[in-house]
Amino acid sequence: MTKYEEITLKPLSSAIGAEIGNVDISEELPEKVVGEIRQALLEYLVVFFRDQDLSDPQHHRRFTKYFGDLFIHPNFNLGQSNPEMVYLTRKPGDTAAAGERWHADTTMMKNPPMGAILYALEVPYWGCLLYTSDAADE
């Protein structure tokens, strides 16, 4: 297991996922911190940052660009002012929601991006997110 000096890391299971702390991803990050986040992503496949504020699209873009070029999803061209970002909202009374059933966000692309960033503002009590991977050791 890698030693992290700038970030804190809490593994969430023996197979996948870790929570990263001691970093404000809305701020400009030193290369060493970005490197440790990249390493944690490679090691744990899915990483989580709690209590962050990416409500400013510029902050969200900057953080995303640490990991590569921004991806414009071909299935979510919603005419929004930030085509690199997909805003999914559900208001009281709405009966349909994107992503309610099993789906893959980007892995079906011929040249998929290295990952995706989800910034959840509010998750309903019944809401859950499942990440899967076929990279686990046997």
Locations of regions flagged by a protein language model:
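Non-heme Fe(II)-dependent double-stranded beta-helix
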Residues: T2-L129
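Conserved small/polar residues in nucleotide/adenosyl-binding loops
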Residues: Y131-E138
